[in-house]
Amino acid sequence: MAAGGAVAVAPECRLLPYALHKWSSFSSTYLPENILVDKPNDQSSRWSSESNYPPQYLILKLERPAIVQNITFGKYEKTHVCNLKKFKVFGGMNEENMTELLSSGLKNDYNKETFTLKHKIDEQMFPCRFIKIVPLLSWGPSFNFSIWYVELSGIDDPDIVQPCLNWYSKYREQEAIRLCLKHFRQHNYTEAFESLQKKTKIALEHPMLTDMHDKLVLKGDFDACEELIEKAVNDGLFNQYISQQEYKPRWSQIIPKSTKGDGEDNRPGMRGGHQMVIDVQTETVYLFGGWDGTQDLADFWAYSVKENQWTCISRDTEKENGPSARSCHKMCIDIQRRQIYTLGRYLDSSVRNSKSLKSDFYRYDIDTNTWMLLSEDTAADGGPKLVFDHQMCMDSEKHMIYTFGGRILTCNGSVDDSRASEPQFSGLFAFNCQCQTWKLLREDSCNAGPEDIQSRIGHCMLFHSKNRCLYVFGGQRSKTYLNDFFSYDVDSDHVDIISDGTKKDSGMVPMTGFTQRATIDPELNEIHVLSGLSKDKEKREENVRNSFWIYDIVRNSWSCVYKNDQATKDNLSKSLQEEEPCPRFAHQLVYDELHKVHYLFGGNPGKSCSPKMRLDDFWSLKLCRPSKDYLLRHCKYLIRKHRFEEKAQMDPLSALKYLQNDLYITVDHSDPEETKEFQLLASALFKSGSDFTALGFSDVDHTYAQRTQLFDTLVNFFPDSMTPPKGNLVDLITL
C-alpha cells in the first residue's frame, strides 16, 4: 500500500498468460494453439476454422482471473483473404455467462492491431477468466476465418483483482436481489417485498422514487405525484434523459435588414468557395472572398446576429494591404486576440507561374481593421506550398495554427520527375503565431504505419480545445473518396485511428463522396457534419440530399438526425426550399458553440443546366432536444390521462369536466398525434365497468397494474443511478 499522502501508482498493465480452452473447429494443421506464437513470416502459423458457418469461435482460459484491458492481433506479413474483417470478443468468469467486450474489425495489412476491451461497469473494473473470440466476416468473401496470433494484456495482480472479483460477485448478487424486489412490488407481493428488503438491506431505488411509488401507485395521490415530478425537473434530474434524446433540426432562413438606397449591395452576393469564421463573443460572422461563377472575389463582410445586418468591411481587401481576390482558401479566428488568419487559394492553370504560385499568408486585426502580410511565401519559411481545399484550425490557448492537406498547385510546364503529373498533397503543419515559425509535423504518407497520415482535399478538420486534439475525417485523394477518421493529439504528437474506414457500417456513418462541412462543440463533446452535394458530376443527380450527422466523441458513435431525399423533394420542391437549404457544395458552415447555432451561406447548387449559378441564401440551424418545460408538461399529461381513465370508471360526469379542463391544458394541441389521442380519450366515458374489471376483486389489481405501468414510464425520465434495474425477472427464464 502507498504511504499516507503518497500519490497512488496506477496498476501495471502486463501480458496475461492463457491457454486454449475450447474451439468450434479447425482445419488441417492450422491448430488453435498456433495463435500462442507470433510468426508473421510463416503462413501456416495460424488457427483456421473448418468453415465460415457460424458460430465459429476460440475460447481462451487465463492462468488466473484478471482485468483484461487490451487484446492484440498479430498478422501474416502480407495481406490475406482469411484475416478477420469483423469479429466480436466476449469475456466472463465462466464460459456460460459472458459479456460483450468488443465489436470491431482488423485492417487487411501486416501491422499488429491492439484494441481496448470493456473492463469497467459503473467505473468499477471487473475481472474475466475466459475470453471468447467470435469471427463474423473474413476479408475474402466465403473464406474460412484465420487468426495468426493473440496477445491479452491487463492486470492480474491478486491484490487488485481480488477486490474487483469480490465487488463483481457482490454486484451480481445485488442486481439479482433488486430484480426480485422489482418483481415482488410490480405484482403487489407486499410481504415478500418487505421481508426481502429488511433481510438484505438493499435499496431498490432512490428514496425519492420510493416516495413517488407510495403516492402514485399505493395512494393514488396524483397531485402529490405532479409536485414531485415538478421538483425533479427543477432540480435537473431529467437532464441526463434530455442529453440522450435525438436532436431535431430547425432551419430558419435569415433575411437580413437592408439599408435604404443601398439596393443589393448591402449584403454579400452569390458565391461558392468563400470562407467564413464566427466570433462567438460578439456574435459576428465574417465572410471573405469566393467565386461568383465568373471571377474570384476580394470583398470582406461582417454579419451581426444581434443587429441582423451585414456590414461591408471592404469591397477589395487587396487595396487595403490585404489578400487578393481568391476562392478555395481557408480562414481561422483567434477569438482571444480578435485576429483572423487566411492561407491558400485556387489558381487557374492559365495564370500559374513561379510568382503567382507563392503562398501568401495574412492576418486581419478586428479592432484596428488592418491587414498584415505575415509571409509572401510560406513554403520559403518552412511552411506549406500554395494549396487549395485544405483545412486550418486555431488553438487560441497555445497561440498555434494547424493546417493539413490540400492539393499543392504546380506550374504546368515544369517536369521535375515522373511524379510531376500526379497530384501532390500537403502534409500537417503547425504555425507558432508568437514566433511566426512553421513546423512540419507529418508528411503526406500512403504507408499504413500507426503514426502515418494520408493527405487529402475537401476533408474536415476540427480542433477540440478541451482535449487538445485535431479530428480529421473524409475527403478525397485523386479519384478515391476516403472514409477514415483519426485524431491527432497536438501536445503528445500522437495519431489515434478512430475508424480506418474499412468497416461496412453502411447507413451508420456519413457517406463518402459528398461535400461535408463539420463543426465541433467541445463542451458537449460532439462533432456535427452537414453532408450535401457531390462535386463529382456523375454522382450528383442520382440522389441529391442533405443529411445532418452527429458524432458523440465519448461514446464513439454516429447518429443521423436528419435526411431529406430527392423523392420527397420532387413533390414539395417549392415549399421545401423555403423550409431548408437545398443540397449544395462549395458552401460554408460555421458554429456558435456558446449559443448553439449554425450559420450557412451560399455555395454551388450543382445545376448542370446553369453551371455558373451560385447561391447567396443565408440560414441558421438550431438542433433542438425536448426542453425541461416540454417534459414537465408531458409527464403531467401522462398523469392526468391516467387519472381521467380512473375517474371515467367511477364518475363519468366528473371525468368529463376533468377531461375538458385539467387534462385539456396539458395537451400540445400543435402535435397532431397528441391531439388525436386526446380526442379518442372521450370514448373511455362510454365503456362499461366490465371493460375495466374482471371477476372478484381484480378491479383493485387492474388499478394497481395500470398505476405501476405509469410509474415505470415516469421512472424512465430519471437518471439510471436512481432507478430500479431495467430488466425484468421473468425475462431470465429461457424456454
From Swiss-Prot:
Residues 172-204 form the LisH domain. Homodimer; may form higher oligomers. Identified in the CTLH complex that contains GID4, RANBP9 and/or RANBP10, MKLN1, MAEA, RMND5A (or alternatively its paralog RMND5B), GID8, ARMC8, WDR26 and YPEL5. Within this complex, MAEA, RMND5A (or alternatively its paralog RMND5B), GID8, WDR26, and RANBP9 and/or RANBP10 form the catalytic core, while GID4, MKLN1, ARMC8 and YPEL5 have ancillary roles. Interacts with RANBP9. Part of a complex consisting of RANBP9, MKLN1 and GID8. Interacts with GABRA1. Interacts with the C-terminal tail of PTGER3. Pfam families: Beta-prop_ATRN-LZTR1, Kelch_3, Muskelin_N. It is found in: Cytoplasm; Cytoplasm, Cytosol; Nucleus, Nucleoplasm; Cell projection, Ruffle. The LisH domain contains a nuclear targeting signal. The LisH domain mediates head to tail dimerization. InterPro entries: Beta-prop_ATRN-MKLN-like, CTLH_C, CTLH_complex_component, Gal_Oxase/kelch_b-propeller, Galactose-bd-like_sf, Kelch-typ_b-propeller, LisH, Muskelin_N. Detected in brain, especially in hippocampus and cerebellum (at protein level). One of its GO terms (cellular component) is nucleoplasm. Disruption phenotype: No visible phenotype. Hippocampus slices from mutant mice show minor differences in the amplitude of miniature inhibitory postsynaptic currents, and somewhat slower decay times. The modification N-acetylalanine is found at A2. Component of the CTLH E3 ubiquitin-protein ligase complex that selectively accepts ubiquitin from UBE2H and mediates ubiquitination and subsequent proteasomal degradation of the transcription factor HBP1. Required for internalization of the GABA receptor GABRA1 from the cell membrane via endosomes and subsequent GABRA1 degradation. Acts as a mediator of cell spreading and cytoskeletal responses to the extracellular matrix component THBS1. This is Muskelin. Kelch repeats lie at residues 284-330, 339-391, 400-458, 469-515, 526-578, 597-651. Residues 206-258 form the CTLH domain. GO terms for molecular function: identical protein binding; protein homodimerization activity. Its main location: cytoplasm. Residues 701-735 are annotated as: Important for location in the cytosol. The keyword Nucleotide-binding does not apply. Signal peptide: none annotated. Keywords: Acetylation, Cell projection, Cytoplasm, Kelch repeat, Nucleus, Repeat, Synapse. One of its GO terms (biological process) is cell-matrix adhesion. Changing T723D: Strongly increased location in the nucleus. The keyword Lyase does not apply.
